[in-house]
Amino acid sequence: MDKYCELIRQRYSQIASGELGYIPDALGCVLRALNEVASDEALSESVREQAAYAAANLLVSDYVNE
């Protein structure tokens, strides 16, 4: 967990403790978040590109591993 930012570690702790709800469709949750970042024109192009690349890699890995 040390390689992740403080906000991610906080949310992890909250989900693990039951304070926040766990989402069983973790891949769908991640893809929705990455899609939101990738389509937000207020963000820098490099941040949007990173989100799009990460989402595309997840989609490919999901289909390749089936």
UniProtKB/Swiss-Prot annotation:
<comment type="similarity">
    <text>Belongs to the UPF0253 family.</text>
</comment>
<dbReference type="Pfam" id="PF06786">
    <property type="entry name" value="UPF0253"/>
</dbReference>
<dbReference type="InterPro" id="IPR009624">
    <property type="entry name" value="UPF0253"/>
</dbReference>
<protein>
    <recommendedName>
        <fullName>UPF0253 protein ESA_03148</fullName>
    </recommendedName>
</protein>
